[in-house]
């Protein structure tokens, strides 16, 4: 007789997980009870409002014409193995689910991978999310125009300016005393040309006006 406290089905986004005795065994192998999985699904389900998210189904279900799966908020995980175990748990009706990332949202396209993400990509996405929270998504996206990883973002990030010339004026005001070195000729200093030279060799500016030192 089935336990009356355990639901016989768990709703996902498109479809349901049938809670059979074998499914309960697989969940236990992954460190879940049915109640644990219900709570985890609430915690990890993405609202698709900008957070880094992936829709996780399986190749087996997809080949059978089913889109059963769940939008998962990656920022709710700190550990790649925990993420994988949760994905396997929501597909515990398969003996050995081959996970399939069917859609993506909220992180750069270079980490989209239908064949499912690697641990390195997962770590990059979590770092991306944390940097977006600390700085801004526009700043991090600008950096990603020039780089594939985020290791040097904080060392490289200078701030946001309206133009290369504005940034050149900032550099001059911070680093030089033109009036002392040039006298009245300081009024004729070509900030536009100086800005072009800075961004030719030492700096980059993204589409949103964020500036990065080349490190």
Feature names for model-found ranges:
Residues 6-15:
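N-terminal acidic leader/helix
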Residues 94, 127, 153, 177-181:
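Extracellular/secreted glycoprotein ectodomains characterized by long, lumenal stretches
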Residues 133-176, 184, 212-215:
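Extracytoplasmic/secretory-pathway segments with low complexity and glycosylation-like composition
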Residues 35, 46, 58, 168-215:
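Acidic, proline/glycine-rich low-complexity IDRs
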Residues 25, 35, 42-91:
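N-terminal ordered "arm"
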Residues 78-148:
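Structured domain cores in non-transmembrane regions
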Residues 7, 20, 31-36:
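Intrinsically disordered, low-complexity coil/linker segments enriched for acidic/polar
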